[in-house]
Amino acid sequence: MHEKSLTELRAALDAKQCSAVELAQTYLKRIEDRKALNAFVHVDAQQTLAQAQAADALIAAGNAGPLTGLPIAHKDVFVTRNWRSTAGSKMLENYTSPFDATVVDRLAQAGMVCVGKTNMDEFAMGSSNENSYFGPVQNPWDRKAVPGGSSGGSAAAVAARLAPAATGTDTGGSIRQPASFSGITGIKPTYGRVSRYGMIAFASSLDQGGPMAQTAADCALLLNAMGGFDERDSTSLTHDHEDYTRYLGQDWSGAGNARDKPLAGLRVGLPKEYFGAGLADDVRASIDAALKQYEALGATLVEVSLPKTELSIPVYYVIAPAEASSNLSRFDGVRYGHRAAEYRDLLDMYKKSRAEGFGPEVKRRILVGTYVLSHGYYDAYYLQAQKIRRIIAQDFQEAFRHCDVIMGPVAPSVAWDIGAKGDDPVQMYLADIYTLSVSLAGLPGMSVPCGFGAGANAQRPVGLQIIGNYFNEARMLQVADAFQRATDWHRMAPAGV
């Protein structure tokens, strides 16, 4: 059962081939047997089985929805009632939330069964899942490699079939990059599509939740439940709720008469900036092969330009740390979170609690953010970065005049070895070159498995990035689903799984 996708598990439940409790027990045992991956930071079998029993009751009563009884793992950045919610930090090591994040609540209302909370880079700050207080996550494809970050635990859990799906968050690539490195499918929706209420904040103008699963069809099902307006999130979009599955299996034109060329009429934009120096040859080969497959499906490839791509790194690493320094000021050891055992006075308690509670990367970003927001530097750094951010968004709109979707690599390379970039944060930041601009513009983007590296990296997956215009998630999922109907990269699993 553990090899099945969400849609296949739904069919198995409907056919009475298994129960929700049996499914939950299967995944709980797999999580226990594969602890060495370090994908999970908190598992509570009692709560999981209680949820599964409730789901079985709904199924027996004929009240099951599309997701009822299906297991889900939650990134530990989403607060979850009666579960530890740590954001991968010592600061929140023992914090138990009194309420559910909107994402958690909506998936629970849909009948999904939580099998645990997944590991992550501390406060979602990282690209490798090495910054977690609970230790690094291993990539199931190659235990020496990182799984990507910051949603590395979620990606590893889905890749290793410890859960059929998981939630993630994406601030600068934290759904797409680990999905690419771990050989699964993940989508970051348009900013505001998924509520941030109960999502422990990193950078509020960038953070966005999304689903991670084996297939685009699974992601569409999850997004149906996760998305929609939430009055408790001031940045939540008021758009009418959509059915993100509505185009799956259809021709791009909608005429229904092009089964051999289902994507005839689709224009795929290829940014020349995404295919230049710095892109590894093995990644380029996998992306080129995927693009040839799209041509075989009827799509037309056109060159476009995103001229400010290189500026996305400095812009992001001004704006995101600035917002983080503000958001993380709430962790002071007074109301909740870690408090130093010994201190002289209130100020000393603040200093020691934060010094002990935050890890090195979080401290680095707080310092950078505080600096760029300080008097005398605000205009030179933060304000300038916001102006360039607007230009980056305009570049995408110009590109979309010539294409329907944009495609390219998710990352310049496959996953690197654990520890390989830990001493050089700039090298780590450069790995996000193809994802940051999408987040800065607030656009939807996704990663789809499309191949593997070469030589010593032959077991390390490569992901194809698909970028859509605002609110175009349903069409992006259609494009990804067409590729997955024609290929089997998404079906592949790590050895021993």
Curated annotation (Swiss-Prot):
GO terms for molecular function: ATP binding; glutaminyl-tRNA synthase (glutamine-hydrolyzing) activity. Signal peptide: none annotated. InterPro entries: Amidase (IPR000120), Amidase_CS (IPR020556), Amidase_dom (IPR023631), AS_sf (IPR036928), GatA (IPR004412). The keyword Ribosomal protein does not apply. It comes from the Bacteria. Heterotrimer of A, B and C subunits. This is Glutamyl-tRNA(Gln) amidotransferase subunit A. The gene is gatA.
